[in-house]
């Protein structure tokens, strides 16, 4: 899908600098207001919608986050980051099966396509988003009561973690969830 870019190069740089500054200082309310203004000014820029969804998410406004993601998906349904953010929003709204559908869209893609495709940001980024999709899918499966599937996905996520590849989830957090699932599986066997 060819999209018209309405932001000039200078506007994009200013936008990115403002975005980075507000995020690094955890000024989520200010960021939300800024992005809402930018969305009015540039309604066809899907990345503004997906960044707005992140701001809503950080503020605990999960319904609004999902709505902003849906708008981004309508504008650019093939950007892996947009799909991932939409899956996160669905998960946050306890729409686990719907989130899995979106995560599967990411997991089915070839790593090189994610890394170097139209919206790609390199191999480390592709490895990161694909592996985090595994973990998020595991948590969705866990919430659906599918312990064995969740466990397999967490084991795979842990096996694919690499030094220098970012994750939204700490290793400690993942290991705790893995142990929880092991305990739950053992409890089912005992009963």
Segments (PLM) and residue ranges:
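TPR alpha-solenoid repeat register
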Residues: 48, 82, 115-116, 133, ...
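Conserved structural position within tetratricopeptide repeats
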Residues: 39-40, 70-74, 105-108, 159
């Amino acid at each position: 899908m060819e999209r018209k870019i309405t932001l000039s190069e200078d506007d994009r740089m200013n936008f990115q600098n403002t975005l980075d500054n507000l995020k690094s200082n955890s000024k989520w309310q200010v960021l939300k207001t800024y992005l809402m203004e930018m969305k009015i000014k540039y309604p066809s820029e899907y990345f503004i919608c997906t960044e707005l969804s992140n701001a809503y998410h950080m503020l605990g406004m999960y319904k609004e986050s999902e709505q902003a993601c849906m708008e981004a998906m309508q504008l650019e349904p093939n950007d892996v980051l947009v799909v991932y953010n939409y899956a996160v929003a669905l998960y946050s709204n306890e729409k686990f099966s719907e989130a899995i559908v979106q995560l599967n869209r990411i997991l089915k893609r070839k790593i090189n396509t994610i890394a170097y495709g139209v919206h790609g940001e390199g191999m480390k980024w592709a490895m990161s988003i694909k592996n985090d999709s595994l973990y998020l899918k595991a948590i969705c499966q866990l919430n659906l009561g599918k312990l064995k599937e969740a466990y397999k996905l967490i084991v795979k996520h842990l096996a694919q973690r690499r030094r220098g590849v970012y994750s939204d989830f700490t290793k400690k957090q993942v290991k705790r969830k893995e142990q929880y699932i092991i305990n739950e599986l053992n409890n089912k066997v005992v009963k």
